[in-house]
């Protein structure tokens, strides 16, 4: 039933899915500090991953990220950051299935997710991702985090299916329904954009707050 509801909602907004919103965003570039951090390496250079055990890193990881505002002025920086996120999550020192920009010190609504539901399981980057609907059906899943070294826990609260809304790098707007383990990755990474870590759900109080979707 949950999947039917999600599908119906997806069809109801289908005509708006490919609307280009790039011209609706005011122009804004990354702040100078962010630009310097992004341009410290080329597209194949991994970035340092912030960890919760470092006090300064922890403060950044707990902050909420800002919306990506597309403009020609920041196109090259945004493209470089996107490639460096992929390089970071694929780095042998980390080897994750997803990463969010705040984890490398960039407080922008950007995530990189490995699409296990697609051929060749590619890593893809998403801008301003939000979850519009969650299925009532949940799935238990063992989770870890690049920012929480040497730890894994099983969560019972992740939705089995989600309806995503996001922007692509060209500013076009998309909706997509995602299921199974890939849906878990999206939920985990989007939490990072809100300053939420998966371990927060292990505490009853935060769990209750987190379920207010």
Model-derived features: where do they sit?
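Bacterial Sec-dependent N-terminal signal peptides
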Residues: 1-28
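Positively charged
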Residues: 18-213
